[in-house]
Amino acid sequence: MPTWTEHIFYKKTGRIPSPGDVVEVAPDLVGFHDLTGYHVLEVLEHMGKVEVFDNEKVVVAFDHLSPPPNQRAAEIMVYIRRHVKSLGLPHFFDVGGGILHQIILERYAMPGQVIFTADSHGNTAGAVGAFAHGMGATDIAAALKLGKTWLVVPAPFKVEVRGEFPPGVMGKDVALHLLGQFGAEGFNGYSVEVFVERPKVFPMDDRATVGNMSTEMGADALMFIPDAVTAEYLKTARGVDYTPPSLEPGNYADKYTVELGRLEPLVAAPHSVDNVKTVREVEGVEVDQVFIGSCTNGRLRDIATAARILKGRRVKTRCIAIPASYEVFKTAMKLGYIDVLTEAGCVVTYGTCGPCLGGHFGVAGPGEVHLTTSNRNFKGRVGHPEAKIYLANPAVAAATAAEGRIADPRPYLKH
């Protein structure tokens, strides 16, 4: 029987290609945002007439420079809006709509689709079993104009997930565990297929975190094999009926098993995503700012976890919390999570990538220590190159904000 990766490529090419084959693939969806969209549209202009193969299959979101923090950013947005209008693109999310990857996940992505984005973290949509792959501006422009582009077929790698999350452990810790085991770029040339033994214990929001950080692992894609959680998510979020496939074991290049019960809260210490330590090893490090959000950890379960820990407390360091989309913000507000966070002293705003890329709304200064739920911690990622960046899950982030130093969240979750 074919693997899920082979199944997807068979649907697109009419054959099961071998790893390393170069194939042409027609995407089901193409996405870009303000930071990359300018370059994508410039390439289209150089190719002649600015046109897209199917305006219903294009998603555009303003998230990186949103709202525009300077004149140049405002000029870029004016330029993109003009093209969005002239092309008649209906799936456009202006300032306040949210982060592109979250929007695609909650509104559009379906199991078995092929999705290309002009951003490396488009693989977030792998949470629902889509082959989601980031590309540069030139390749995205070609895909938009021609309705197809080339891919090197990756080798399938199977990850089995067993057990259930202990208190204080989340999807971020699965991602950090894999990074610690295989290293940054350890999955180069692979399409990672994740099978969850007990689907209900691994929520969709946590799956999205793992898919998102597969970029840091070097994976071409990471897909959770569709199951009951996938079907429930699609029904609840969009009213779509979906029946998960019954897959027989396929032939994989390699396999690995994650035992959730053996994990504990993990932290990626400066200055590499694979410099992974347990929270106990870095506990007590004083922190200047905490960021809870991003396309990695700005979903409802992330915000709810932070609110649970911070309820009735005041933060002892700067704390910025950003839900990843308007839908997440709206739901978090209805459930009271936004009130809890603001009363705790957090600065809360709508979906923007600002702090994650060191662009605005919380840039790191020289010598500062930042703990963030985002996905990268190399020098200069969140601002000044002399800043130190730690990556962790939202529970660790909230506990750290409560204490002003890196803290184990488990004592906060005992009752």
From Swiss-Prot:
It holds the Pfam family Aconitase. Pathway: Amino-acid biosynthesis; L-leucine biosynthesis; L-leucine from 3-methyl-2-oxobutanoate: step 2/4. Its cofactor is [4Fe-4S] cluster. Transmembrane segments: none annotated. It is an enzyme of class 4 (lyase). GO terms for biological process: L-leucine biosynthetic process. Keywords: 4Fe-4S, Amino-acid biosynthesis, Branched-chain amino acid biosynthesis, Iron, Iron-sulfur, Leucine biosynthesis, Lyase, Metal-binding. Binds 1 [4Fe-4S] cluster per subunit. It catalyses: (2R,3S)-3-isopropylmalate = (2S)-2-isopropylmalate. One of its GO terms (molecular function) is 3-isopropylmalate dehydratase activity. PANTHER family: HOMOACONITASE, MITOCHONDRIAL (PTHR43822:SF2), HOMOACONITASE, MITOCHONDRIAL-RELATED (PTHR43822). Belongs to the aconitase/IPM isomerase family. LeuC type 2 subfamily. Heterodimer of LeuC and LeuD. Catalyzes the isomerization between 2-isopropylmalate and 3-isopropylmalate, via the formation of 2-isopropylmaleate. NCBIfam families: hacA_fam, IPMI_arch, PRK00402.1. This is 3-isopropylmalate dehydratase large subunit.
